[in-house]
UniProtKB/Swiss-Prot annotation:
Keyword Signal in annotation: yes
Extracellular topological domain residue ranges: 22-709
Gene from which this protein is expressed: Tlr12
Cytoplasmic side, ranges: 731-906
Top-level taxon: Eukaryota
Annotated organism of origin: Mus musculus (Mouse)
Name this polypeptide is given: Toll-like receptor 12
Length: 906
């Protein structure tokens, strides 16, 4: 599998998508779809504003997370067996959805939320698996007009309800054997199965169903179909009569017999019949008599050797006739003795064996507008052949020898606008009447190889010109006239052409030229031969330039000086015999209006910011079949001026540390969308680790990534140093606290917390070293002294009664559990002492959680805000307000304190 990187930053005018790091999705605007159309095989809808294609999908939810929510077209390919409910509910504006996911079932509600969807397609390998669709699968698709299911087999009794606005239904490459099975799959099609009187489809496509051989009588009763496509199926058209179709206008079919589908034509009064790639051979008069309703008849590649007499007379309404790819040796369409006139407007006789056209070949076709005679064996043409074709607009004679053309051979065609003479051996005449009427605007012509310079006489007011150069042509051609004021499109195919423009430059000869295509051309004839090697044709109105090299360019030609150029395509400019690497700035110069740039097999090796500084309007950059690309780090600083879309397709980035900066940069990019499809493995990597191999290679081998590793290591060290005080705090407080709680819980399980037990101490006194003086001088005499001055209680003081050598936590726990009452002496210093905090926290926890909690008394030696106490202690104060007291400074109030303490200690 290839490697895909998807890195965001879409156009600011589009909803910005963030968080994309890697994906196998490609997004584009509809206007730019032709640049990347190969990745949108199933949804080539350039009228949509925004499209996305995702390949190798295995986790649909994860894949769709990176797709912009505003896409109108979505193509998905991969392996996802089940479509879950609300699978596309995040895309309410979706209009076209194509799924090639090897689906086996759609769960109810899978297409919920797609109220604007107009076209839905399911694709799979033919006859491989079944697709389960619930009856209400399309109930939410209120705008659906087109439904295509190609490949999977449907249940014959699925009972799927169709959206009311559906106009186009296709079930192709499936297991269907009988047309009547459609009634079980889609019962709405049959009259009486729903509230509709009858269903009308613009097109029903059943093509390429290799098992389709039957049509059960009455199975589609009442259905109205404008176009029915049965091409590449074994079903004979004669079966269609009994289907019960209320209407059928056009039929695409193949016939298993050597007969025209005349019965179907007569039964439905068809307006169109297209029978291709069938062995008809000849047409009988009986079959011809049934075709009087036809307006279109297509009989391409049907093995016809001749046409029956009265062929056109039998079809008075016929407007379009296609007879290409047959074995006709003569075109006897018009019978002079009858004088009948046909309404035919289009006639295609291409690919036959016509050598000579009779004088009256087209005499009955005064309404003919398009005549196609390509790839026959015509040797000569005379003007009288076209005398009756006063309305003819298009004449195509490509692929005929045409060794002789009569004088003024096109003079009889005043309406002719398009003429194609490619792949002919025509000898052009300088006489003014050679090209016929002045309305000729589009001309395609092959120039013969000449031993000496020659003048190329052309119509002056052409708008489109295509010139193919014969191999071996090396001499100059001088154009006549010297100016073509209306020419907008020029295509030159083949190398060796040298146009002599006289004293004028190209802009003077072609002042209106907007589109220029140079095919199979090395550009040597269009570039200066000095050190600069600049493109010579300075055309101020040129908007599109396409160059397809012949693989023999000696050096790059700099395309510059075209102020209106919007689209530039350069392909196959790399020399096959002497390949060399080039920089983008050697190919593209100052093009201020350029919006789309496509480079394919040009030898490009690196991209730098310098190349983009003269391309201020560039929006799309496509790189195809370029090897070992390096992206210079100067692009990092130039990021705000980068194109909105960069596609690196079927190309590979060099496994070089110069590219190490790129991955983190593109992940942070906020304006440029970059899609990289790279199939290459770096040295030392196997096929199993191909995905993401370049990033892993750069991570392991490049000093830039070593610096990153050192940065991460130092960051981890700093983090650890910051965390040490926290760990120390946990060691001094929370860990002992948890240990103590565990011991209390464990002793409770062992029965040591029973109410009847005898206590070793009456009071456990918790205090800090700073408060020890108050405990000894004030508290100890009052509690341990004998009556009447004291209470005669036994106190547990940590400094005096803790067992030497025993763990502090164990001493605290044992002493608390061995005391009837816990007395915490609190002050500012005590709250900062770790042991006092532990004792207070433990005592509070026992008060709140123990099944037989001890008495907890709090003595505050100084005023302390409750916000200074931990949460547990604040809660304890709120629960038992009588268990705490403040030590008074005034002597007269101390007796009240001792009275409170004696009452609490009983």
């Amino acid at each position: 599998m290839g490697r895909y990187w998807l890195l965001p930053g879409l156009l600011l005018s589009l909803p910005l998508v963030t968080g994309w790091s890697t994906s196998n999705c490609l997004v584009t605007e509809g206007s730019r779809l032709p640049l990347v159309s190969r990745y949108f095989t199933f949804c080539r809808h350039s009228k949509l504003s925004f499209l996305a294609a995702c390949l190798s999908v295995s986790n649909l939810t994860q894949t769709l997370e990176v797709v912009p929510r505003t896409v109108e077209g979505l193509c998905l390919g991969g392996t996802v067996s089940t479509l879950l409910p609300d699978a596309f509910s995040a895309f309410p504006g979706l209009k076209v959805l194509a799924l090639s996911l090897h689906l086996t079932q759609l769960l109810p509600g899978a297409l919920r939320g797609l109220g604007q969807l107009q076209s839905l397609s399911f694709f799979d390998s033919p006859l491989r698996r079944s697709l389960f669709l619930p009856p209400d699968a399309f109930s939410d698709l209120i705008s659906l007009q087109r439904l295509h299911i190609s490949g999977p087999c449907l249940d014959k009794k699925a009972g799927i309800r169709l959206p009311p606005g559906l106009q186009w239904l296709g079930v192709t490459l499936s297991c269907i054997q009988d047309v009547g099975e459609l009634a079980g799959m889609f019962p709405d099609l049959v009259q009486g199965s729903s509230s509709r009187v009858s269903w009308t489809l613009q097109k029903l496509d059943l093509s390429s169903n290799w098992k389709l051989k039957m049509a059960s009588p009455g199975s589609l009763q009442g259905l109205q179909v404008e176009i029915l496509d049965l091409t590449r199926t074994p079903l004979d058209a004669v079966w269609l009569k009994g289907l019960g179709l209320q209407k059928l206008d056009v039929l695409y079919a193949q016939t298993a017999t050597a007969e025209l589908a005349a019965e179907a034509v007569a039964h439905f009064e068809l307006q169109g019949l297209i029978v291709k790639e069938s062995k008809i051979g000849s047409i009988s008069q009986e079959a011809l008599a049934s075709c009087h309703s036809l307006k279109t008849l297509g009989l391409s590649s049907t093995g016809l050797t001749k046409l029956p007499p009265g062929f056109l007379t039998a079809m008075p309404r016929l407007q379009r006739l296609e007879l290409s790819g047959n074995q006709l040796q003569s075109a006897v369409l018009c019978m002079n003795e009858t004088g009948d006139v046909s309404g035919l407007t289009t006639l295609d006789l291409s690919g036959n064996r016509l050598r000579i056209l009779p004088p009256a070949a087209f005499s009955c076709l005064p309404h003919l507008r398009e005549l196609l005679l390509r790839y026959n064996q015509l040797l000569s043409l005379e003007g009288y052949l076209f005398q009756e074709l006063q309305q003819l607009e298009t004449l195509k004679l490509d692929g005929n020898p045409l060794l002789h053309l009569g004088k003024n051979w096109l003079a009889a065609l005043p309406a002719l606008t398009t003429l194609s003479l490619l792949d002919t051996q025509i000898r052009m005449s300088p006489e003014p009447g050679f090209w016929g009427a002045k309305n000729l605007h589009t001309l395609s012509l092959k120039l013969p190889a000449l031993p000496a310079p020659a003048v190329l006489f052309l119509p002056m007011y052409l708008t489109s010109l295509e010139l193919h150069i014969a191999s071996g042509t090396t001499e100059h051609w001088t154009l006549s006239p010297a100016i073509f004021p209306s020419l907008e499109t020029l295509t030159i195919s083949g190398g060796g052409l040298k146009l002599k423009l006289g004293s004028q430059n190209a802009s003077g000869v072609f002042p209106a030229l907007q589109k220029l295509s140079l095919l199979k051309n090395s550009l040597d004839a269009f570039c200066s031969q000095g050190t600069s090697n600049l493109f010579l044709w300075q055309l101020p109105k040129l908007q599109s330039l396409r160059v397809w090299g012949a693989g023999n360019s000696s050096r790059p030609c700099l395309i510059t000086g075209l102020p209106s150029l919007r689209e530039l395509k350069l392909a196959s400019l790399q020399s096959i015999t002497q390949p060399r690497s080039v920089q983008l700035e050697e190919l593209v110069g100052d093009l201020p209006q350029l919006q789309a740039l496509v480079l394919s097999s040009t030898g490009l090796k690196s991209l730098s910011a310098a190349a983009f500084q003269r391309l201020h309007s560039l929006q799309v950059l496509v790189l195809e079949y370029e090897k070992d690309l390096m992206l210079q780090d100067s692009l990092r600083e130039y990021s705000p001026q980068m194109p909105h879309y960069i596609y690196i397709l079927e190309s590979n980035l060099a496994c070089h540390c110069a590219n190490a900066w790129m991955e983190p940069w593109v992940k942070r990019s906020t304006k440029t969308y970059i899609y990289i499809r790279d199939n290459r493995l770096c040295p030392g990597q196997d096929r199993l680790s191909a995905r993401g191999s370049l990033p892993s290679f750069l991570w392991d081998h490049c000093p830039q990534t070593l610096e990153l590793k050192l940065f991460l290591a130092s960051s981890a060290l700093v983090f650890m140093l910051i965390a040490l005080p926290l760990l120390q705090e946990a060691r001094n407080s929370w860990i002992p606290y948890l240990q103590a709680l565990f011991r209390v819980w464990l002793q409770g399980l062992r029965g040591k917390g029973d109410k009847g037990k005898r206590f070793l101490f009456d009071v456990f006194v918790s205090h800090c070293r700073q408060d020890q003086g108050w405990v000894i001088e004030e508290l100890l005499p009052a509690l341990e002294g004998f009556l009447p001055a004291g209470l005669g209680l036994r106190l547990c003081l940590p400094e005096r009664d803790f067992e030497p050598g025993k763990d502090v936590v164990d001493n605290v726990v044992d002493s608390m559990l061995s005391s009837r009452t816990t007395l915490c002496v609190l002050s500012g210093q005590a709250l900062c002492n770790p042991r006092c905090r532990l004792e207070l926290r433990l005592a509070t926890s026992l008060l709140l959680a123990a099944p037989s909690p001890p008495v907890l008394l709090l003595v505050f030696l100084e005023p302390i805000s409750r916000h200074q106490l931990p949460g547990y202690h604040r809660l304890a104060r709120l629960l038992r307000r009588g268990d705490y007291c403040l030590w008074p400074e005034e002597e007269e109030r101390k007796s009240g304190f001792w009275t409170w303490l004696r009452s609490r200690l009983g």
